[in-house]
């Protein structure tokens, strides 16, 4: 076992411009000798960046410590493995004292040593006559195992064969997985392998281009110091962390420097708790050796109130990405209300359910905790209130689940409720009898005022007309405020450069006539996220997630009559396909939570339904993939489509802007990209997973459809719409908005009849219909 470590080196050059071809040479792929083998240390647990001199000194000290522990652990591992191997393969070793290929030995005996063995031999194969489409008979002879298991000699087999026409060969395509809806994908900070770009490509040159884009490094460009597996890593971390007093980032980074092909620094930082689950003894707490990890998984789970998706209401949704948010305010107020029966009720006379029945509680005990009025005493039941936040923080063994269930089951007699939902044999629970459950309800009851009860309660919903007017006034006031800031900036610029300020302001107003009109213009500049804050929503609310967009959605927890909330439309059924519909004009699909008249929630196929609801319902035109006259494969219609009618959605992996840059750097070298950028941030990549829309080709002169970004259930999705009336079997094309460089690359692909399309420019953004206007 060697104690040497791969030599380190710093990057020899900066990242080159994307899209430029790397230098090539004849022969196999080669690696550069002077490579930046390791990425820089990342401040994961440290608040400040560690100085380079201090970091290198700490790394060297940590290396010596880890290597000292490693030698003893590796020796112990070798002894354990040797004993297991001797036990497990002892019988096999007896029967396999020498390695013999019986099949090869018999062939050598029959054919002679050193003779070439022909796998196939063709006989009686006549030439194929192109004018005569009859195919002559042929036979194929091949060698099978020449002896049976019993040792009997087998005969050679001859099988008849014939030649057939190959026919048209479809263009090849990259393997992909079909999906119906885009899936949120986390960033890949570590490149798992270096892609193959062809023979003669210098991997070292490509490495220099990509290393700065992957903060966790590229696997395979540095050698491990020695062999390591999960068991050895667990033993090593447990031994080293006991006495380690340095920076945790230096510790995990040193592990990465010693074993760069095992994991990255970020992966090492979260590996120890997982290793403890597999190898540690029962009851061992990993946080005792990693005190810098303050947030525990269990504590996070206790604070999680609602793990449902904010968009589709699915439990821990994988499509939109699970985002656990803790709202400041509870919907429908901060309190639950329930009716609790009072003792000495004539209707409850009779036998008690047990010796610990709630009926044994006296009215004096109740009066010390609750304050029922005279009417409640006559009715023999009192109205109590439970604070939602208190129940959310309450452990289950203290009765949190019982209180939650009782709120929705007050119609059941209390004794029957306890018999149904309280486990008397549960030793861990503190609530094990009817009397315990009654005392629990009394102890959880809150004495609140009428004013406090109204806090958080939803207001009565205004009419659609009032909500539209409020929203309109709010948007116009925001537009005026933005216009004033813009004009003030132009005046400062004119004063600095000696220009005419009024002229600059007039030119600015003329560039967009909508700024001077009374029409509301909605533009989303960030992804739509439901706001969770106290107080009204406006441009000055710092904690409002809707502040930059200036629009709240139906998912927000603000008041239902919030002037910033998008009110939806009031169109008749089937009319939401023109700019007269404010949902269609704002690039929002209709939603049953806001639109009441357009029948977007209808499920009956016999009635007229909303026409601005295609992506939500996933109602798409039937399409198929086939050879295209433009380039490779293309997308074709199986049914006609009217002008501006929704055809299909562009689905794939929903990735961030940084991840799109990383993938784009690799795709550009293939001259093939399926990344579709969204103006509000992120992109859709259908390279590996997607739908048939990935085959839509580029046509800048006569496109048959256009792409449009729509807000659907709070997220931006890309749809293709017909630019004119389209017939069956017409190819679906749209303008990729190529730059001059990409136009040249596209013409080269057309000449070579490539099966895949060249990369779309990274600068392409979609926010509105891409029309010729």
From Swiss-Prot:
Residues 1-33, 749-773 are annotated as: Disordered. GO terms for biological process: epigenetic regulation of gene expression; gamete generation; germ cell development; germ-line stem cell division; heterochromatin formation; methylation; negative regulation of gene expression; regulation of gene expression. Its main location: nucleus. Residues 616-737 form the SET domain. Residues 750-759 have a biased composition (Basic and acidic residues). SUPFAM superfamilies: SET domain. PROSITE patterns: CXC, SET. Residues 1-13 have a biased composition (Polar residues). Residues 505-614 form the CXC domain. It is an enzyme of class 2 (transferase). Disruption phenotype: RNAi-mediated knockdown results in extended lifespan in wild type worms and in a glp-1(e2141) mutant background which lacks a germline. Also leads to reduced H3K27me3 levels on metaphase chromosomes. Double RNAi-mediated knockdown together with mes-6 RNAi results in ectopic expression of the homeobox protein egl-5 in the head region. This ectopic expression of egl-5 in the head region is enhanced in a nfya-1 bp4 mutant background. It comes from the Eukaryota. Keywords: Developmental protein, Methyltransferase, Nucleus, Repressor, S-adenosyl-L-methionine, Transcription, Transcription regulation, Transferase. Residues 1-194 are annotated as: Interaction with mes-6. Gene3D superfamilies: SET domain. It is found in: Nucleus. It holds the Pfam family preSET_CXC. In adults, it is predominantly expressed in the germline, and weakly expressed in intestinal cells. Expressed in the hypoderm. Belongs to the class V-like SAM-binding methyltransferase superfamily. Histone-lysine methyltransferase family. EZ subfamily. Polycomb group (PcG) protein. Catalytic subunit of a the mes-2/mes-3/mes-6 complex, which methylates 'Lys-27' of histone H3, leading to transcriptional repression of the affected target genes. PcG proteins act by forming multiprotein complexes, which are required to maintain the transcriptionally repressive state of homeotic genes throughout development. In association with the nfya-1-NF-Y complex, may play a role in repressing the expression of the homeobox protein egl-5 in tissues such as the head. This is Histone-lysine N-methyltransferase mes-2. It comes from Caenorhabditis elegans.
């Amino acid at each position: 076992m060697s104690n040497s470590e791969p030599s380190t080196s710093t990057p020899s050059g900066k990242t080159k411009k994307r899209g430029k071809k790397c230098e090539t040479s004849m022969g196999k792929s080669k690696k550069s000798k002077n490579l930046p083998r390791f990425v820089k240390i990342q401040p994961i647990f440290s608040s400040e960046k560690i100085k380079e001199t201090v970091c290198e000194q700490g790394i060297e000290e940590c290396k010596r410590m880890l290597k000292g522990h490693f030698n003893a652990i590796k020796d112990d591992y070798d002894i354990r493995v040797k004993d297991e191997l001797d036990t497990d393969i002892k019988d096999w070793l007896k029967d396999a004292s020498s390695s013999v290929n019986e099949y090869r030995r018999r062939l050598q005996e029959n054919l002679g040593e050193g003779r070439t063995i022909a796998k196939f031999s063709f006989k009686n194969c006549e030439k194929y006559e192109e004018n005569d489409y009859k195919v002559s008979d042929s036979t194929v002879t091949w060698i099978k195992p020449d002896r049976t298991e019993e040792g009997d000699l087998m005969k050679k087999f001859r099988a008849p064969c014939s030649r057939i026409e190959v026919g048209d060969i479809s263009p090849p395509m990259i393997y992909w997985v079909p999906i119906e809806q885009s899936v949120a994908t986390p960033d890949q900070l570590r490149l798992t392998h270096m892609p193959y770009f062809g023979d003669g490509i210098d991997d070292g040159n490509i490495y220099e281009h990509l290393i700065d884009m992957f903060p966790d490094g590229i696997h395979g460009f540095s050698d491990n110091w020695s062999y390591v597996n999960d068991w050895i890593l667990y033993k090593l971390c447990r031994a080293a962390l006991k006495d380690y007093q340095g920076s945790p980032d230096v510790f995990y980074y040193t592990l990465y420097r010693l074993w760069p092909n095992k994991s990255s620094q970020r992966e090492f930082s979260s590996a120890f708790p997982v290793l403890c689950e597999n190898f540690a003894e029962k009851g061992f707490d990993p946080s005792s050796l990693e005190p810098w990890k303050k947030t525990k998984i269990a504590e996070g789970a206790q604070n999680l109130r609602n793990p449902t998706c904010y968009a589709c209401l699915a439990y821990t949704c994988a499509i939109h990405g699970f985002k656990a948010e803790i709202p400041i305010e509870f919907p429908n107020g901060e309190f639950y209300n329930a009716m609790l029966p009072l003792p000495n009720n004539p209707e409850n006379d009779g036998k008690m359910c047990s010796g610990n029945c709630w009926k044994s509680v006296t009215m004096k005990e109740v009066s010390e905790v609750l304050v029922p009025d005279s009417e409640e005493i006559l009715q023999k039941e009192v109205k109590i209130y439970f604070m939602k936040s208190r129940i959310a923080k309450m452990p289950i063994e203290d009765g949190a689940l019982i209180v939650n269930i009782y709120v929705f089951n007050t119609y059941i007699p209390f004794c029957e409720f306890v018999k149904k939902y309280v486990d008397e044999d549960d030793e861990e629970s503190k609530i094990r009898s009817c009397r315990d459950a009654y005392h629990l309800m009394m102890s959880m009851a809150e004495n609140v005022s009428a004013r406090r009860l109204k806090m958080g309660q939803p207001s009565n919903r205004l009419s659609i007309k009032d909500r539209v007017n409020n929203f309109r006034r709010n948007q116009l006031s925001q537009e005026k405020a933005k216009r004033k800031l813009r004009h003030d900036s132009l005046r400062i610029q004119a004063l600095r450069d000696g220009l005419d300020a009024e002229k600059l302001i007039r030119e600015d107003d003329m560039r967009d006539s909508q700024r001077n009109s009374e029409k509301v213009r909605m533009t989303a500049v960030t992804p739509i996220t439901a706001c969770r804050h106290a107080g009204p929503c406006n441009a000055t609310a710092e904690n409002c997630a809707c502040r930059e967009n200036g629009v709240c959605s139906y998912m927000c927890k603000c008041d239902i009559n919030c002037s910033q909330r998008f009110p939806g439309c009031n169109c008749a059924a089937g009319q939401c396909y023109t700019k007269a519909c404010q949902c269609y004009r704002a690039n929002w699909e209709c939603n049953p939570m806001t639109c009441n008249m357009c029948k977007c929630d209808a499920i009956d196929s016999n009635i007229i339904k909303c026409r601005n609801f295609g992506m939500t319902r996933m109602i798409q035109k039937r399409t198929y993939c086939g050879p295209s006259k433009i380039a490779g494969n293309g997308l074709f219609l199986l049914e006609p489509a009217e002008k501006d009618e929704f055809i299909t959605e562009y689905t794939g992996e929903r990735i961030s802007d940084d991840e799109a840059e990383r993938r784009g750097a690799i795709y550009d070298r293939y001259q093939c990209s399926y990344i579709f950028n969204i103006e509000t941030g992120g992109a859709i990549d259908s390279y590996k997973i997607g739908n048939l829309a990935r085959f839509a080709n580029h046509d800048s002169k006569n496109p048959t459809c256009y792409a449009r970004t729509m807000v659907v259930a709070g997220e931006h999705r890309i749809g293709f719409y017909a630019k004119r009336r389209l017939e069956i079997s017409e190819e679906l094309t749209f303008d990729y908005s190529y730059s001059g460089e990409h136009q040249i690359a596209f013409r080269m692909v057309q000449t070579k009849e490539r099966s895949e399309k060249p990369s779309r420019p990274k600068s392409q953004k979609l926010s509105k219909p891409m029309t010729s206007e």
